[in-house]
Amino acid sequence: MFAPLQNDTFLRACLRQATDHTPVWLMRQAGRYLPEYKATRAKAGSFMGLATNTDYATEVTLQPLERYPLDAAILFSDILTVPDAMGLGLSFALGEGPRFATPVRDEAAVNKLEVPDMNKLRYVFDAVTSIRKALGGRVPLIGFSGSPWTLACYMVEGSGSDDYRLVKTMLYQRPDLMHKMLAINADAVALYLNAQIEAGAQAVMIFDSWGGVLADAAFHTFSLAYTARVLSQLKREHKGVTIPRLVFTKGGGQWLESMKQLDCEVLGLDWTVNLAKARALVGENGPNAKALQGNLDPNVLFANPAQIEAEVAAVLNSFGAPHTDLTQTGPTQIFNLGHGISQHTPPESVEVLVRAVHAHSRSLRKQQG
C-alpha cells in the first residue's frame, strides 16, 4: 500500500541506532511562516477547514519538504482534535488561537465526558493515509496528540491561559474530578494514536505543552502518570515494524530522571536543558536509555545565517560525540527546536538550519573516523 522508506535516519535515531548524519525536523514545520501555507489556509477558509480536509492537510504537511531536506514529516493537525470530538466545540479565531464553546468546569460537565467515537476523527486518519501515500517513502510520517494534562488545561480554561487558574483550582479543590477527566483523556489519546498508527503513522509523539506549569508533586501525579497511561496502551509495532514513541514536556527538564522511566523511545527537550547533562542522565547506555530530541531556541532563527550555523553547531557539540557503532545501540540525537517554530520566522533561516545540521553532524562523524 505504501512505498518503501528511502530515508530512515529519523526512525533509526529514535531507536538509538547509528546514522550518517543527525536527523532534523521542526515542531510546527508546516505552518504560518511559509507563504504557501498561508495561501492554502486562505483557500480552506479557516484552520479547521484546513485540518479537516484531507487534500489540504496533505498539501500543507508536504510544503516544508518541498523546500527543505528535512528527515521527517509530521501530520498537519491540532492537539485539540480529541476534546473537539468529545463535543466541546473547537474553533480558531484568526490570531487568537483555539477556543472551546463549552469548557469543562464542574462535576456535571466532567460526568458528561467520555472517550469519543474514533469515527468522529476519521478526517485525521484519512489525512494520515493520504500523506503517507503522497510522501512516496521520502521520509517517515510522525503522528501526534496532546497529552492528557495539556488537553485538560484547554478543556477547563476554554482557551490558552496565562496563569492556569481554573484548571489548577479544579486540580487542588477537586482532584477526584481532575483524575476522572485525565483518565478519560488518556484512554482517548491512546485510541487516537493507535488509529493513526493503523492509518500509516510511522512514529507517534505526545505533546505535553503545559506539563511545565505544574508544581513538582502535581507534575508526577497529574501529568506524568497519565502520559504513562497512554504509553502503556500504545502499539509497539505495526506489521512487524517498530513504531517509536516520543514524549515532549515543555519546561520538563528538571524531571528527566522521572521521565526516563516512561515506556517510550525518545524524550524531547526544550531550549533550557543542557544536552550533555541530559545525555548523561537519560541518553547513555543502560536500562531505559532514551534518544533525545531538541533543542535549539526557536528565536535563533531570527539571527543572521552565520549565527544560526554557530548556534546549530553549539547544540550538536553540546550533545557530544555521535554514536557511530553500527553493531549496537548508543546515545542518539534528533535535532529539533526547543518549541514550535515562530510564525514570524524567515523561511530562508530554516534552509540555513537544516543544511547546517546535516553538514556539521556529518563532519563530527568524520572527525571520529
From Swiss-Prot:
CDD domains listed in its UniProt record: URO-D (cd00717)
Report the Pfam families cross-referenced here.
URO-D
Tell me one GO biological process term. Answer: protoporphyrinogen IX biosynthetic process from glutamate
Q: Which cysteines are joined by disulfide bonds?
A: none
Give the matching Gene3D superfamilies. 3.20.20.210
Catalytic class of the enzyme: lyase
Gene Ontology cellular-component annotations: cytosol
Q: What is its EC number?
A: 4.1.1.37
Positions that bind substrate: R28, Q29, A30, G31, R32, D78, Y154, S209, H339
Domain of life where this protein originates? Bacteria
Q: Where in the cell is it found?
A: Cytoplasm
Recorded GO molecular functions are: uroporphyrinogen decarboxylase activity
> What reactions does this protein catalyze?
uroporphyrinogen III + 4 H(+) = coproporphyrinogen III + 4 CO2
First-listed, main subcellular location of the protein, grouped into a coarse class: cytoplasm
- List residue numbers at the site (Transition state stabilizer): D78
Assembly information from the UniProt record: Homodimer.
NCBIfam families to which the protein is assigned, alphabetical? hemE
The record's annotation in PANTHER family points to:
METHYLTETRAHYDROFOLATE:HOMOCYSTEINE METHYLTRANSFERASE RELATED, UROPORPHYRINOGEN DECARBOXYLASE
Its biological purpose: Catalyzes the decarboxylation of four acetate groups of uroporphyrinogen-III to yield coproporphyrinogen-III.
The protein's name is Uroporphyrinogen decarboxylase
Q: Which organism is this protein's natural source? A: Polaromonas naphthalenivorans (strain CJ2)
Q: What is the lineage of its organism?
A: Bacteria, Pseudomonadati, Pseudomonadota, Betaproteobacteria, Burkholderiales
